[in-house]
Amino acid sequence: MKVITGGVTAAKGFEAAGVEAAIKYKNRKDMAIIYSKKPCVMAGTFTNNVVKAAPVLWDKKVVEESPYGQAVIVNAGIANACTGKEGYEYCRKTALRASEALGIPEESVLAASTGVIGMQLPIDRIEAGIEKLVKAKTDTIEAGTQAAEAIMTTDTHSKQAAVEIEIGGVKVTLGGMSKGSGMIHPNMCTMLAFLTTDAVISKEALTKIVKEDVEDTFNMISVDGDTSTNDTLLVMANGMAGNEEIKEGTPEFEAFKEAVHYINETLAKMMAGDGEGATALIEAKVIGAATKEEAKILSKSVVCSSLTKAAVYGHDANFGRMICALGYSGVSFDPDKIELFFESKAGRIQVFKDGVSTNYDEEEASRILAQPEVTILADMKMGTKEATAWGCDLTYDYVKINADYRS
């Protein structure tokens, strides 16, 4: 696997664009398009929130019922959630306008939105934005970057990744982009993620890979514990690489799965580290758990702990907060067997063993926690299973950003 520059336009046959449409923001790009020159096999996962935004309902229908997809229209600023029948009708109008402009079936167009909940979309601006997107779309790396920038809300930077692999001697490319900064606690922010590939793969095989991998990547991040109404991951495969079809149970399937995992994990970590107001990416790694599921529960409990997040922000080696988070996770374990470590580029230090503090050096621990990427490692001494979750520190700016989000 080779990591390359780019995002959703890295794979053969994909075009993108980002334009200003004045949906809610002024003087910035706020609409994006991803378009494939050929119809795509589609797979997707969506929010588990009972309250689902209109575009989530639309996209679920397209992914499940349409034979293929070919374009995605994304807007930032307004979520089109809690908008009733009118909001869903605006999804249909978005798809209709895009289908007319692109010359493709309405049922092959997907829609995604992110932003303020409860506001109706200005459909006239959406339709005008679609016209601009269709004219602007190209297959350049820059076009992919513009699309990634256009879908941002409180994100501080765009998020992209791309790789190349070989399938039966044929080069296959995968690329992706995502957005998410606040309201990220997906169980599939708002978390939006889009992957494109030129691989030849069946819908069944692609769906299996996506649904399994999301459990170890996007569903293992948390910024603020809120699961959005709009969380969406869409994957498009247009087959233009011309490889022999990837089938389950083959080495090619595993190679493709590894590439999808790399893209998903890279984008997930970018989102976790770009939490609203964040200064550090927190990685909570649990090893020695009895089961994989328990390892996941334990690691997510740590990254979801507000007290843990605040401690990392303050570079305070208050290990009790992490032990406490493990303790209320719902997983049974022997506290006297746990070993807890802090790790970063500044070093590694053990802070807890045999049920008590290790009398560690506070200054050394603080230096380790002062790095932009920090790992909290917990060895449960119960088995061989492990899991990793990602989050960010909790700062004063998080409250400031969300106190006036609608203004």
Task: Say what each PLM segment does.
Residues 1-75, 79-89, 99-407:
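A structural signal for small-residue-enriched, beta-sheet-centric alpha/beta enzyme cores
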Residues 95:
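Generic structural marker for isolated residues within well-ordered, non-membrane alpha-helices
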